[in-house]
A protein has these predicted regions:
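Short hydrophobic/aromatic beta-strand or adjacent loop that forms the aromatic wall/cage
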Residues: 1, 76, 149-153
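Short, hydrophobic/proline-enriched secondary-structure or compact coil segments at domain edges
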Residues: 1-9
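Nudix hydrolase/Nudix homology domain
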Residues: 4, 13-29, 96, 167-203
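Acidic surface patches and DE-rich sequence motifs
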Residues: 6, 83, 92, 141-142
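Conserved beta-strand and immediately adjacent loop positions that scaffold enzyme active sites
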Residues: 78, 87, 174
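Unchanged
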Residues: 104-192
Length: 203
């Protein structure tokens, strides 16, 4: 299955026999060509009540690639950072709790991107990059052009007691360590793509 997020909404690409299709609130959509992709994106963009749309297909990867081809694709890297106490690093950006991430520079290894962006957005160093958690996809429109951002999320361990310094020029107003037991209310005020990262990390 592939998930493509539009802020708090989601397009899912799944097999025709996927259990998720039994959800009575799931809207099904059949793709016939690139025009259908644009119609679907327009529909998701303008509808406040449309939360999840599923595209059942026997060719999940081919359908995913066809959708990606209709966007300007960009890559990003980010981190789910924990410290030795087991707390997790969250940032507040534009009124939502988020994880530090940012765009890949030309020629840059994506793991290096993730490490650099965490350091820039939170002011911390002494990070140990462990394993790739998952890759999430989300769409946004900039200057009238639809972008599809693929974000590589890495598990990171912070080993130094340096204070957090939010990168205010990136609209980050706060960075905080949150105990695992205190995460639920924070995750209620974040994006589904960030919730997916925590889910894939089994947190």
């Amino acid at each position: 299955m592939h998930r493509i997020y539009f802020e708090k909404r989601c397009i899912l690409i799944c097999s025709p026999d996927d259990q998720i299709l039994s959800d009575p609130n799931m809207i099904r959509f059949s793709l016939g060509g690139s025009q259908d992709i644009h119609s679907l994106v327009d529909m998701v963009e303008v509808s406040d009540s449309l939360h999840r749309v599923c595209i059942p297909t026997s060719d999940i990867q081919g359908t995913y690639k066809a959708i990606c081809a209709e966007f300007l694709e960009v890559n990003a890297g980010g981190g789910l950072v924990s410290n030795r106490r087991g707390d997790y690093l969250l940032i507040s950006r534009n009124g939502m709790w988020d994880l530090p991430k940012g765009h890949q520079d030309p020629g840059e290894d994506i793991q290096v991107t993730a490490l650099r962006e965490v350091q820039e957005e939170t002011g911390i160093s002494e990070l140990e990059v462990r394993e790739l958690i998952c890759i999430t996809d989300h769409c946004y429109k900039r200057n009238g052009i639809w972008h599809l951002k693929h974000t590589w999320w890495y598990d990171m361990l912070y080993t130094d007691p340096t204070d957090l310094t939010p990168q205010t020029e990136e609209d980050i107003t706060k960075a905080a360590w949150v105990a695992r037991s205190s995460l639920p209310p924070y995750l209620l005020n974040t994006y589904p793509s960030i919730q997916e990262v925590f889910h894939e990390a089994k947190i």
